[in-house]
From Swiss-Prot:
Gene: nr6a1
DNA-binding feature ranges: 11-86
Biased composition (Low complexity): 142-156
Organism placement in taxonomy: Eukaryota, Metazoa, Chordata, Craniata, Vertebrata
CDD domains attached to this UniProt entry: NR_DBD_GCNF_like, NR_LBD_DHR4_like
Biological process according to GO: animal organ development; anterior/posterior pattern specification; cell migration; midbrain-hindbrain boundary development; neurogenesis; regulation of transcription by RNA polymerase II
Annotated compartments: Cytoplasm; Nucleus
Any one GO MF annotation of this record: zinc ion binding
Function per UniProt: Probable orphan nuclear receptor. Binds to a response element containing repeats of the motif 5'-AGGTCA-3'. Required for anterior-posterior patterning during organogenesis. Acts with chordin to play a role in patterning the midbrain-hindbrain. Isoform Em is required for integrin-mediated cell matrix interaction during neurulation and for the morphogenetic movements leading to formation of the neural tube. Also mediates the effect of retinoic acid on primary neurogenesis.
InterPro entries found in the cross-reference section: NHR-like_dom_sf (IPR035500), Nucl_hrmn_rcpt_lig-bd (IPR000536), Nuclear_hormone_rcpt_NR3 (IPR050200), Nuclear_hrmn_rcpt (IPR001723), Znf_hrmn_rcpt (IPR001628), Znf_NHR/GATA (IPR013088)
Zinc finger residue extent: NR C4-type: 14-34, 50-69
Protein name as it appears in the record: Nuclear receptor subfamily 6 group A member 1
Length: 435
């Protein structure tokens, strides 16, 4: 397996400048030049300046013209600075899968040098070099992706959900201080990844994808979601329906795990640990892909027959608002990408195989399995979509958002879930209608 994966790396382009990649460095596929530049910048605590608009084109020929924009793109693409030891010695500590997502505020602190000043007052002995780590898992050390800051007004979208519902039932304008469309999927206005040439799909990728497709249950959901015309759904009835739906989706994820092609490779203890940590994320992924027709069709019709009270609207929490806006953006992103079944099953396996979860006894084996499907997904996207060079990074950057949303959902009071899903589904229906 390692030989095949190493061969696949040789065909990759550096995600920073488009030069030929030499391997997985600090969590992402990159060339030796960008690997060394990032390491020197972090170890030497460099603070750069851009003489233009902080949006310089990064390419093999132009990457040395602006060090500020080069380091900025390293951070935006997910290079993990915490995987570098200040003494430059090897021996990685923070092995993770997929790029590390950090907030705008944290990026700004690094670029301005403030982060280095703060770290100077703390111990640096825990840092380690991860040149040989697999692609990073887009989670922080606490196993939760970093929150994504709100974008500038020029990149925000009008939310058609909660604010319009509030206006409808209260007759007053909704709050205007919320910003939507987190920026985390937009890396640069200038794509720099070299488009893949037309080629065939690797036979091993084809086999592994077919195995995942076979494990997926694509049968329609059994939970009844049909309501007579004119019937008014109460909050408790909608909540009970959401619970039944969640139960069925969870049962399907348990069945899915038992059908995975690598089920015999891990212990029951590790599977239990992985599933107990990722089940909400798996349900979310399957809801916006495999079962989206029923979720955004039948369930939307049910929620439309539920009218929240004035008190429910007033008591809707900040956590509920944040979860809703992120759900809307995730739905829009999946709709724009038109995520295929093959990509979905790979993303689901990658998300499930998170070796950073505490309590796993075979973390290295989980990591190798994760790397396998990381390469399979990249191989497939480059084969199926050769003219969309940024597609694979876009897909992978959806995963930290899925994890963040799932983690935030537990903070939303149970009694607010009916309103949350009504507003979310109403907004998504509006988005689909406009598009």
């Amino acid at each position: 397996m390692d030989t095949w994966e190493d061969d696949r790396v040789d065909q990759r382009a550096c995600l920073i400048c488009g030069d030929r990649a030499t391997g997985l460095h600090y969590g992402i596929i990159s060339c030796e030049g960008c690997k060394g530049f990032f390491k020197r910048s972090i170890c030497n605590k460099r603070v750069y300046r851009c003489s233009r608009d902080k949006n310089c084109v990064m390419s093999r020929k132009q990457r040395n013209r602006c060090q500020y924009c080069r380091l900025l793109k390293c951070l935006q693409m997910g290079m993990n600075r915490k995987a570098i030891r200040e003494d430059g010695m090897p021996g990685g500590r923070n092995k993770s899968i997929g790029p590390v997502q950090i907030s705008d505020e944290e990026v700004e602190r690094i670029m301005s040098g403030q982060e280095f000043e703060e770290e100077a007052n703390t111990s640096w002995s825990n840092n380690g070099d991860s040149d040989h780590s697999s692609p990073g898992n887009a989670v922080s050390e606490s196993n939760q992706p970093s929150p994504v800051s709100t974008p500038s007004s020029s990149r925000s979208m009008e939310l058609n959900g909660f604010s319009s519902l509030r206006d409808q039932y209260l007759g007053t304008p909704g709050p205007t201080h919320y910003q939507y469309l987190p920026h985390l999927f937009s890396f640069s206005a200038h794509p720099t990844i070299i488009p893949a040439q037309s080629r065939s799909l690797d036979p091993q990728s084809h086999t592994l994808i077919n195995q995942l497709l076979t494990a997926e249950d694509i049968e329609p959901l059994n939970t009844p979601m049909l309501i007579e015309d004119g019937y008014k759904v109460t909050q408790s009835e909608l909540f009970a329906l959401l619970c039944r739906l969640a139960d069925e989706l969870l049962f399907r994820q348990i069945t899915w795990v038992k059908k995975l092609p690598f089920f015999c490779d891990l212990s029951i203890k590790d599977y239990t640990c992985l599933l107990s940590t990722t089940w909400q994320e798996l349900i979310l992924l399957s809801s916006i892909t495999t079962y989206s027709k029923q979720i955004f069709g039948d369930l939307t019709d049910v929620t439309s027959k539920y009218s929240p009270s004035e008190d429910e609207l007033h008591r809707f929490s900040e956590d509920g608002m944040e979860v809703m806006e992120r759900l809307i953006y995730l739905f829009r992103k999946f709709s724009q990408l038109k995520v295929s079944n093959e990509e979905y099953v790979c993303m689901k396996a990658i998300n499930f195989l998170n070796q950073d979860i505490q309590g796993i006894s075979s973390a290295s084996q989980v990591e190798q399995l994760n790397k396998r499907y990381w390469y399979v997904c990249q191989d497939f996207t480059e084969y199926r979509y050769p003219h969309q060079p940024n597609r694979f990074p876009d897909l992978m950057m959806c995963l930290p958002e899925v994890r963040y949303i799932a983690g935030k959902l537990v903070n939303v009071p149970l009694e607010q879930l009916p309103l949350l899903f009504k507003a979310f589904l109403h907004s998504c229906k509006t988005i689909v209608t406009k598009e």
